[in-house]
């Protein structure tokens, strides 16, 4: 949806207003939930009997990564998540520049193509989300849908390599967008399933979920930097497509290595 809205401003005299609209939407995403959600009860009077120093020490310990012992599958899932998200973001965050510098479109032509690409991505992602989650629950397996998502990622990233055209990039959006929807629908459940039982008993599962989200964010942060470096070194997006496919392959390999989840 964000890509579609930004394409409406691209190449227009009011192009800079896109930044203003984006900033307002970011602000609204924080303010609206704050106004709607019930007020959270204060914990200052819980009376757990801990001194200030003990509470501070516990808070600092909670910021440390989970222990590796008993959490091997969890770290495999985190590594797989980082690589899968990096694979998708390496290309999806650069589609505008791919249209302009790889395919050779003008700014106006790229803006029109971005609108089409965003619509394609939106539709196929919803289809992937709607099908993958219920299917995963029905077959009681997490790794199978993720393997399918990986195949879709790889097919998508190779389409612009084989077809250096608008249609090639749109094929990327169709395959990779569908793969993204399939993956996102199952990824969260997988990362909950691999949380060690000890953490569930100690009620520290939130720490594991937070660390898993960090892996997700790191993948999206490292991806554009990696693409920029590859393009700067090679002078083309060709290598970025190949590396993106390899990241997806490495990510799904880690996930398939998980032993505690089917």
Give the role of each language-model region.
Residues 10, 128-141:
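Helix-to-loop junctions at the C-terminal end of transmembrane segments
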Residues 93-112:
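Short amphipathic helix-loop junctions that connect adjacent transmembrane helices
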């Amino acid at each position: 949806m964000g890509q579609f809205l930004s394409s409406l401003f691209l190449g227009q005299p009011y192009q800079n207003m896109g930044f203003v609209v984006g900033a307002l939407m970011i602000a609204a995403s924080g303010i609206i939930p704050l106004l709607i959600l019930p007020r959270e009860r204060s914990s200052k009077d819980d009376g757990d009997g801990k001194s200030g120093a003990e509470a501070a020490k516990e808070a600092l310990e909670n910021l440390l990564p989970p222990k590796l012992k008993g959490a091997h599958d969890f770290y495999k899932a985190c590594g797989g998540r980082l690589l899968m998200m990096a694979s998708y973001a390496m290309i999806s965050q650069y589609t505008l520049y791919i249209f302009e510098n790889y395919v050779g479109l003008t700014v106006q032509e790229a803006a029109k193509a971005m609108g089409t690409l965003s619509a394609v991505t939106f539709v196929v992602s919803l289809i992937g989300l709607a099908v993958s989650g219920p299917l995963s629950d029905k077959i009681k397996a997490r790794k199978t849908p993720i393997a399918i998502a990986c195949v879709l990622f790889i097919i998508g990233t190779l389409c612009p390599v084989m077809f250096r055209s608008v249609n090639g990039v749109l094929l990327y959006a169709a395959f990779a967008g569908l793969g993204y929807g399939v993956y996102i629908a199952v990824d969260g459940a997988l990362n909950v399933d691999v949380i060690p039982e000890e953490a569930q008993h100690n009620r520290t599962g939130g720490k594991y979920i937070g660390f898993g989200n960090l892996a997700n964010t790191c993948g999206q942060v490292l991806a554009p930097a990696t693409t920029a470096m590859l393009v700067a070194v090679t002078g083309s997006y060709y290598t970025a497509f190949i590396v993106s496919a390899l990241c997806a392959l490495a990510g799904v390999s880690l996930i398939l290595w998980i032993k505690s989840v089917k």
